[in-house]
């Protein structure tokens, strides 16, 4: 698969040691393993080959993959989330912990916590002390991927629309090209999206890196609002 290709991937991720399903994009697999979540949408993951969004072992395997072919392979911790690092397990006072959480009632062993801008997991809480593990939850874990590249996005407009969706989670933009320049008409409601300012700059960088576009124009259209006539 060529570097820079934008692809849709169905995948299942397992813990090699326990055999437990960690993640999946497929509803039937989630139900089979009794981890189905009604609140989420199961659909293929979208990624750009070689842009570093995924763990190293998966990126390397994707570079040699073909579409519509199912692969199953294992990744050692060094090519995934690294080995566990004992120096990332720290003991702090309970007072420091309590000052760092918004709702102490939600604390429990295994609960995620943020201390001084660092994300970790509460391992122990007793005698006025708390032990926090700042390792990635999958550090030291060998992983098994089963995946299929189900689609390669073709065409400039389609690739732009897909990058927009990747960066914003939305698909209600309008895309127009004039030579190498692109104009993107924004949906009205994006004005209320607090993440748009950051996503916009990330998107421009992605467009220039993966599509080599020229000028990028973000177009806002504000139409007059007409008051509804009163019912007689």
Residue map of PLM features:
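FKBP-type peptidyl-prolyl cis-trans isomerases
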Residues: 1-232
């Amino acid at each position: 698969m060529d570097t820079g290709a934008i692809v849709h991937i169905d995948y299942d991720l397992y813990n090699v040691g326990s055999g437990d399903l960690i993640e999946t994009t497929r509803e039937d697999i989630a139900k089979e393993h009794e981890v189905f979540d009604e609140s989420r949408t199961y659909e293929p993951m979208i990624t750009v080959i070689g842009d570093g969004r995924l763990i190293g072992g998966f990126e390397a395997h994707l570079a040699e993959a073909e579409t519509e072919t199912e692969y199953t392979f294992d990744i050692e911790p060094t090519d995934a989330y690294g080995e566990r690092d004992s120096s990332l397990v720290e003991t702090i006072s309970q007072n420091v912990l309590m000052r760092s959480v918004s709702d102490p009632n939600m604390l429990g062993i295994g609960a995620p916590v943020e201390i001084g801008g660092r994300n970790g997991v509460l391992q122990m809480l007793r005698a006025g002390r708390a032990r926090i593990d700042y390792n990635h939850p999958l550090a030291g874990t060998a992983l098994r991927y089963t995946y299929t590249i189900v689609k390669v996005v073709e065409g400039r407009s389609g690739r732009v629309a897909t990058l927009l969706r990747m960066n914003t989670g939305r698909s209600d933009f309008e895309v127009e090209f004039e030579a190498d320049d692109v104009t993107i008409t924004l949906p009205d409601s994006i004005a209320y999206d607090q993440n748009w300012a950051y996503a916009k700059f990330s998107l421009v960088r992605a467009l220039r890196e993966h599509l080599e576009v020229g000028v990028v124009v973000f177009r806002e259209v504000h139409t007059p609002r007409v008051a509804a006539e009163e019912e007689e």
